[in-house]
């Protein structure tokens, strides 16, 4: 089976080594276990003693019950039996495609987005199509265009909300309309929600798993909870037939998740409100820095992100995004992701949730480079 190179991952693997100012990664101030204990107020000694005593077997095949209880609290209608743990959100997305999609099915994906959501279906589905999100529409989908892409063989509509790389956020009404479109077609909706809950104003964001019975919401401990090292994600879906299908396919490639990872994640989710509040504060402070820089610049523009930790920044001079980001990395130590990794040009993605000082320094280096480039 042929599949396209994962452009973002290839780029990050190659250019992260140049990073003095990391504006490429999109997690929020990754936490250590020490920081997790400080934030939660949990007794570190008691927890570590229980962790050391934990038998390193396969654990609970469908996920630790305490963890699933914590995950269920992130939704309105999702229960513990509707949840299946996976190895990261990437593992969850892959499992959904592998379990549901037949070669003759139509899969509709929105771009720009996380490449996994369109390259995997394109690799084994003969009828994979994309709907282009446009800057002039605030990177929100044109629902008339979506309706026109629906065919009798449509199996799955893939969305990413909040959107990576643009930071666009679909409101509840739009999500409900997408659910209605899918329902008429008898299709599932895969909603990658790894940034759900991260916004400057701590806005409560709806989940597709709550809106639509055949909605499949994917999330993880990586972005919202700053614990990417756990490599733990999940699927939330109220459609029992889909969950049974996911379990059946999951048994062939992972069996279960790490009992250690699930125990730490359970601790974190007991304190989810505190972690989300911490991270929304970081989003707000860093977005203020980015927005001020954009507004003071002659050469850069963006659609201000509504949620998440990423922004797509456009520039008005003639240089391919790959060359610009290559030079910024090697000459200025600024690590960015070029727009070409998202099928876009004359732009780059900024992962803006760093310390405000590092973010400001990195943005200043970009300005310095552009000023020198345009002078010659």
What is each model feature region?
Residues 124, 184-185, 297, 332, ...:
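Helix C-cap/helix->beta junction micro-motif
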Residues 99-121:
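Conserved PLP-anchoring active-site segment centered on the Schiff-base-forming lysine
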Residues 266, 282-291, 302-315:
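Conserved glycine-rich beta-strand-loop-beta hairpin in the small C-terminal domain of fold type I
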Residues 210-244:
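Active-site PLP attachment segment
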Residues 1-88, 268, 372-376:
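N-terminal small-domain helix-loop-helix segment of the aminotransferase-like
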Residues 77, 108, 147-148, 318, ...:
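PLP-dependent enzyme catalytic core of the Aspartate aminotransferase-like
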Residues 243-250, 268-291:
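Structural signature of PLP-dependent enzymes
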Residues 135-203:
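Active-site phosphate-binding strand-loop segment of PLP-dependent enzymes
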């Amino acid at each position: 089976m042929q599949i396209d190179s994962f452009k973002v991952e290839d780029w990050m693997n190659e250019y992260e080594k140049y990073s003095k100012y990391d504006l490429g990664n999109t997690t929020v101030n990754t936490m250590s276990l020490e920081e997790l204990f400080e934030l939660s107020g949990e007794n570190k000694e008691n927890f570590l003693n229980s962790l050391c005593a934990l038998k390193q077997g396969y654990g609970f095949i469908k996920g630790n019950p305490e963890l699933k209880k914590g995950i269920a609290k992130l939704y309105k209608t999702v229960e513990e039996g509707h949840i299946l743990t996976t190895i990261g959100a990437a593992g969850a997305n892959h499992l959904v495609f592998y379990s549901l999609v037949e070669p003759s099915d139509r899969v509709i994906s929105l771009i720009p987005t996380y490449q996994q959501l369109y390259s995997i279906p394109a690799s084994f589905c003969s009828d994979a199509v994309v709907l282009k999100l446009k800057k002039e529409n605030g990177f929100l989908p044109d629902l008339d265009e979506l309706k026109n892409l629906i065919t009798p063989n449509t199996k799955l509509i893939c969305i990413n909300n909040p959107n990576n790389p643009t930071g666009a956020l679909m409101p509840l009404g739009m999500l409900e309309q997408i659910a209605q479109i899918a329902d008429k077609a008898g299709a599932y909706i895969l909603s990658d929600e790894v940034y759900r809950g991260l916004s400057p104003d701590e806005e409560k964001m709806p989940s597709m798993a709550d809106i639509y019975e055949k909605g499949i919401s994917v999330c993880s401990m990586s972005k919202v909870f700053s614990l990417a090292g756990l490599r733990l994600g999940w699927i939330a879906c109220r459609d029992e037939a889909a969950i049974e299908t996911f379990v059946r396919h999951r048994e062939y490639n992972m069996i279960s998740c790490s009992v250690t990872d699930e125990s730490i994640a359970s601790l974190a989710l007991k304190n989810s409100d505190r972690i989300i509040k911490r991270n929304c504060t970081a989003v707000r402070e860093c977005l203020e820095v980015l927005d001020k820089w954009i507004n003071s610049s002659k050469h850069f523009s963006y659609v201000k992100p509504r949620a998440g930790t990423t922004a797509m920044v456009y520039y008005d001079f003639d240089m391919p995004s790959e060359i610009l980001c290559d030079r910024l990395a090697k000459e200025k130590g600024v690590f960015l992701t070029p727009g070409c990794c998202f099928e876009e040009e004359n732009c780059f993605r900024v992962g803006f949730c760093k310390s405000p000082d590092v973010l400001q320094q990195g943005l200043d280096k970009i300005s310095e480079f552009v000023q020198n480039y345009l002078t010659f």
